[in-house]
Design a protein with these regions (language model features):
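ER/Golgi luminal nucleotide-sugar-dependent glycosyltransferases, focusing on the catalytic module
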Residues: 1-116
């Protein structure tokens, strides 16, 4: 079961690198949208399962630009070579509270969508 992790971020490259390292798995790809105003890309630990969104948006908090950034991530995921069973959208400030094994196992046995 292949999953995609979509991350929107603008700061704190150390935290983004922690997320990248946490989600290292053959069945997980990571798509990262870095705010156009940000200069943290050169500090990110890009691995084989990490894809940077090229069409970056100048995101303004609470404005439609956040939706634009999200849509750009989803477009890139849709245009990839994989058909993912799940796509998880998280902020660069988030961090999972369960182990990667528990995270994967939870979704492995689900047979539903979480958005109607």
């Amino acid at each position: 079961m292949k999953m995609a992790i979509a991350i929107q971020c603008h700061t704190n490259s150390e935290q983004i690198n922690r997320l990248i390292n946490y989600f290292q798995d053959d069945y997980i790809d990571i798509y990262i949208h870095v705010d156009k105003k940000s200069n943290i890309i050169s500090e990110l630990d890009i691995k084989k399962n990490v894809y940077l969104i090229e069409n970056r948006v100048d995101v303004k908090w609470g404005q439609f630009s956040q939706v634009d950034a999200t849509l750009n991530i989803f477009k890139e995921i849709r245009n990839s070579d994989y058909k993912y069973k799940y796509i998880h959208l998280i902020s660069g400030q988030d961090y999972p509270i369960k182990s990667l094994k528990a995270f994967k196992e939870y979704f492995l046995y689900q047979n539903s969508e979480f958005i109607e």
